[in-house]
Design a protein with these regions (language model features):
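Conserved N-terminal Rossmann-fold NAD(P)-binding element of oxidoreductases
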Residues: 3-7
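N-terminal Rossmann-fold NAD(P) dinucleotide-binding loop
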Residues: 12-13
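C-terminal amphipathic/interface module of NAD(P)-dependent oxidoreductases
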Residues: 45, 49-52, 232, 239-268
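NAD(P)-cofactor binding segment of oxidoreductase domains
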Residues: 60-102, 136
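Conserved Rossmann-fold NAD(P)-dependent oxidoreductase catalytic core, especially the SDR/UDP-sugar
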Residues: 87-127
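Catalytic helix-loop patch of NAD(P)-dependent Rossmann-fold dehydrogenases
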Residues: 114-150
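Substrate-positioning beta->alpha
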Residues: 156, 162-166, 175-197
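Mid/C-terminal beta-alpha module of Rossmann-like enzyme folds, strongest
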Residues: 192-247
Length: 268
């Protein structure tokens, strides 16, 4: 199987290493010329892409693709997500052979929903412009005419991106929140395992990828700050946003099991 990976950031770089044990011909894209030498050993070929790149020569020879793009400092959500999706969908519209596409979205598309639990079938109407862009991007991939799988990721944590590091940034800060909102996280290991699971089983449609641990922001970050001997965040008592818990039951029913179902405070 010829597989092209769009995006070699935090998740993409880790995935490329995991794919080395698989019988795939891997093609890699990057927007940074300085990363070509680093990525060469992880794939058959590395392509530098920009706004003028013709995606047809990259995508059409392949049997599938994984889209893991993320905005850089100078790129907007529209440029990174929506424009990329439109170009990919336009490239795939006349494809006759089977093709599998997996895109990692975000549970932030669920913002503004006034329900305690959110499933993949919950009607969405994002409030922010970025949320609207992410939801539109999902729709473009789902309507692209190929077998498409959307993984909505919770807050990512793992090596070099720990929850403790995040707590340090929040320490002593006044938060525009009561802290009573549930959290929805996912460990890097489970993201990689879920992507491979979706590839192996050709899952189609939208799947939430969050763990089973939804302790509140106040409980989580107070615990983390105590471990690090830091002042906890200062929570506001006035907020109209109660937050929500994202359900992972659909991907579990498909057969996926989590390596990190619960947060291990101080061990991430």
């Amino acid at each position: 199987m010829k597989l092209i990976i769009f995006g070699a950031g935090y998740v993409g770089s880790a995935l490329l290493k995991d794919l080395q044990t698989r019988d795939y011909q891997i093609y890699i894209t990057t927007t940074q010329e300085k990363r070509v030498d680093e990525l060469k050993s992880l794939g058959k070929e590395v392509f530098i892409i920009n706004d003028k790149t013709d995606f047809r020569d990259l995508i059409l020879p392949c049997d599938g693709m994984i889209v893991l793009v993320a905005p850089g400092q100078l790129k907007s959500y529209e440029e990174t997500y929506l424009n990329t999706a439109q170009k990919i969908a336009s490239t795939l519209k006349d494809r006759k052979k089977p093709f599998f596409l997996l895109y990692t979205s975000s549970t932030s598309v669920c913002e503004g929903v006034q329900e305690d639990w959110i499933t993949e079938g919950t009607p969405l109407n994002p409030i922010s412009e970025n949320g609207k862009i992410l939801l539109k991007t999902e729709q473009i991939y789902l309507e692209s005419g190929v077998e498409a799988c959307i993984l909505r990721l919770g807050g990512i944590y793992g090596p070099n991106r720990t929850l403790l590091d995040r707590a340090k940034r929040f320490s002593g800060k006044i938060m525009n929140s009561s802290g009573d909102e549930p959290t929805n996280h996912i460990h890097l290991d489970d993201i990689l395992r879920a992507i491979l699971f979706c590839l192996d089983h050709t899952l189609k449609g939208v799947y939430h990828l969050v763990n089973d641990d939804h302790r509140t922001r106040k409980v989580l970050y107070t615990s983390l700050c105590q471990i690090a001997h830091l002042q906890p965040p200062i929570w506001s008592s006035m907020t109209s946003h109660k937050g929500y818990k994202v359900s992972n039951s659909k991907i579990k029913k498909a057969g996926f099991s989590f390596a990190h179902p619960m947060l291990q405070i101080g061990k991430d």
